[in-house]
């Protein structure tokens, strides 16, 4: 049997609602404010068929470039064969949510500003870049009176 060519082909689980989350969409979904430049995650909601994004955009993150009464315009990167295209799509607000991907960065910016301010008052230099985790400190291992056992690999024997 051949594959059908429908818009919602293969979305049985993708657009289904979670367990005990069927029915009316919570009002908090409509109360969220979206502005130009916001970073949003696209996640299709099966209860609302209007303004639903195509399945290829499900789970993607984009930037808002246009806001209307019920929907927003989003710029999303989409891979088409060998190239990545910046696609502009219009999606209703039920199918998007603010992305948390930028929160950690903004938090770090605030912390760095605070560190800079304190360092300027003290007249000292402060490290602002994130550093990789250093190697663990040296420590002694307790043997409780037992001798350490030396482990050696078994020598290879060719059997033919």
UniProtKB/Swiss-Prot annotation:
Residues 112-123, 136-145 have a biased composition (Basic and acidic residues). GO terms for molecular function: structural constituent of ribosome. This is Large ribosomal subunit protein eL21. It is found in: Cytoplasm, Cytosol; Cytoplasm; Endoplasmic reticulum. Component of the large ribosomal subunit. The lineage of its organism: Eukaryota, Metazoa, Chordata, Craniata, Vertebrata. It comes from Mus musculus. Component of the large ribosomal subunit. The ribosome is a large ribonucleoprotein complex responsible for the synthesis of proteins in the cell. Keywords: Cytoplasm, Endoplasmic reticulum, Ribonucleoprotein, Ribosomal protein. The gene is Rpl21. Disulfide bonds: none annotated. GO terms for biological process: cytoplasmic translation. Residues 112-145 are annotated as: Disordered. The keyword Repressor does not apply.
């Amino acid at each position: 049997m051949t594959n059908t060519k429908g818009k919602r082909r293969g979305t049985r689980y993708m657009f289904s609602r979670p367990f005990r989350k069927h029915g009316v969409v919570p009002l908090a979904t409509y109360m969220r404010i979206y502005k130009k430049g916001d970073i949003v995650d696209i996640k299709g909601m099966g209860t609302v068929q209007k303004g639903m994004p195509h399945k290829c955009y499900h789970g993607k993150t984009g930037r808002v470039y246009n806001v209307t009464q019920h929907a927003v315009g989003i710029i999303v990167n989409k891979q088409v064969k060998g190239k990545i295209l910046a696609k502009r799509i219009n999606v209703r607000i039920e199918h998007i949510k603010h992305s948390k991907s930028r929160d950690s960065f903004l938090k770090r910016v605030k912390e760095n500003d605070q560190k800079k301010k304190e360092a300027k008052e003290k007249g000292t230099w402060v490290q602002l870049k994130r550093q990789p985790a250093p190697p663990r400190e040296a420590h002694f291992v307790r043997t409780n009176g037992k001798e350490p056992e030396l482990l050696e690999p078994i020598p290879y024997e060719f059997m033919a």
